[in-house]
Amino acid sequence: TVIVSGGMIQKDFALDFLKKLQKENKDQKLQLVAADRGLDFFRETGLVPDLADGDFDSVSAEGKAYLDSLTRTRIMKLQPEKDDTDTQSALNLVIDQGARSILILGATGGRLDHFLGNLGLLTLGKQKGVKVALADEQNYICLVESGTRLYKDRQFGKYVSFFPAGGAVEGLTLEGFKYTLAGYNLTVADSGLTVSNEIQEEAVSYTHLRAHETVLDL
């Protein structure tokens, strides 16, 4: 499942990334979801969402006309005053429908408060047993748990960075990286230590944390 949120989005990157995802999941059609102003991405690219969710208060006039023209799209109109964002509402909806792997585009560029809120959706997904990731043309952001293997030939970009997802991370070990760690207690205050690392081994690099702790992988 791919949710397109209302933040800034590089359309050429997004279209290429969607093609890549569909190729990797050739036996199953991607479910495409427009979260509020993310609807404009579909209007501008000619793609048709399977689901449109939001109060649509920030959608352009052209986007609202496009919304009215959709005949094969399930539309969930929300009240402007609510207890979550349109992106979180869309995420909860597709999880309730059975989605187990969700990518969110348009979630990193624009308002910083929305970006920080979208980072929290990674933890929300983990709590519900669902993998959630955010992506743009420069970043792929997900949670990393103990024992995660990162393959050099599959990595998104040149660099790999780690940040605590919540409180301090105890016992962080990085093997096979340019800058290794052994049993390090990583806090937000010193997370600059784990910025712009590089996978050194050709095959695989390892992360190890104590049980039930996670870090953000960018």
Predicted regions and their residues:
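Class I SAM-dependent methyltransferase SAM-binding "motif I" and its flanking Rossmann-like core
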Residues: 123-155
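General beta-strand structural signal in soluble alpha/beta enzymes
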Residues: 4, 33-36, 54, 76-77, ...
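A charged, well-structured terminal subsegment
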Residues: 160-180
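Short Gly/Thr/Asp-enriched flexible loops that form oxyanion-binding sites at enzyme active sites
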Residues: 113-123
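Conserved small/polar residues in nucleotide/adenosyl-binding loops
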Residues: 207-214
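A conserved acidic, glycine/proline-rich C-terminal tail/linker
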Residues: 176-201
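Short phosphate-binding loop-to-helix
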Residues: 75-96
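N-terminal beta-strand-loop-alpha-helix module at the start
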Residues: 1-66
